[in-house]
Amino acid sequence: MRKKVVSPAQRRAFAREVVNQELCSQRGACRILGLARSTFNYHGRPPTPAEEQLRKRLLELSTEHPRYGYRRIAALLRREGWRVGKRHIQRLRRDEGLRVPPTKRKIVRRGVSTGLPTTATHRNHVWTWDFIADATVRGGALKLLTILDEYTRECHVLWAERALKSADVLHWLQKAVEQHGAPEYLRSDNGSEFIAKIVQRWLKTNRIKTIYIEPGSPWQNGFVESFHGRFRDECLNREQLWTLTEARVVVGDFRRKYNEVRPHSRLGYESPAMFAARSCPFPAPVGLRPPSTGNGQRNNENINSNKCLD
């Protein structure tokens, strides 16, 4: 019979329980628990009708606002005209067994980086990928996948869907690698699509190292965040997208102009395609090993894929 006894009221209740079970005398129980016999024999005065009404209202407010602590509950009661202090309310809540349950911390899944944080020094050195969200005029969700080369700033993939799963992002990554060659490193956040086992197996098979940024640190993926800022400012905020098909056409046209026409200040005001052609001749695409599972492989290519890839 082991209990954690802290307050005098708890010690008194425990001592009475021991005495009622005839396990010990009253004097012995008080001596063992460090409780005065006057405290053992103390019986509080019965609650007044006003006290009963206060307790009833306290329970009502605590049920209505389960995340409010004793300070806010006391403030609400004083607003209603009750003359109470916060310590009084704290004691009443404790007597009633009321408390604000602690917030459960969310388990943050994190990918395991297989490469060190690296700054791109040549084409296909570091790629980065991420999502950006938008909506159609009627409120339909749009989720867009972006894949960039951090050195040339070329946008290899910009694809819109209602929802994108790990098999979908792997499909578009495969197509980008088949056309542009494989990167040495792939940078991303810890999104569930990017740390999925099917993606991890494929990257390991094709010897592509991963660089996962710290949770809640988008600045560590600054290239794609900068691109998304330009994309939203120059395209998404200016266009009214009514359907998914229209969204694919619009973002495909933006990707083409971004790669081939738009001057980029970091590239000496050349377009990414011009910079890539001048400074780094196109490498021969490397051969790919098949994925370790068939879940991420698609047999039929989407008819609109030519608007997503170069």
Q: What function would you assign to each model-found segment?
A:
Residues K4-A13, C30, L35-V126, S217, ...:
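Basic, flexible linker segments flanking DNA-binding modules
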Residues L23-S25, Y68, V84, W242:
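Residue-level signal for the short linker/turn that defines the boundary of a DNA-recognition helix
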Residues N206-I208, G229-D310:
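C-terminal domain-tail junction helix/linker
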Residues A29-C30, F40, L58, I73, ...:
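Mobile genetic element proteins and their domesticated derivatives, centered on retroelements
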Residues R83-L148, E154, S166-K175, Q179-E184, ...:
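Mobile-element integrase/transposase regions
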Residues K3-I32, G287-D310:
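Charged, often Cys/His-bearing segments associated with DNA-binding zinc-finger transcription factors
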Residues P49, S188-S192, A196-R201, T210-D233, ...:
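RNase H-like two-metal-ion nuclease catalytic core shared by retroviral integrases
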Residues T39-Y42, E154-L158, T210-I213, N237:
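Short small-residue beta-strand/loop micro-motif enriched in glycine and branched aliphatics
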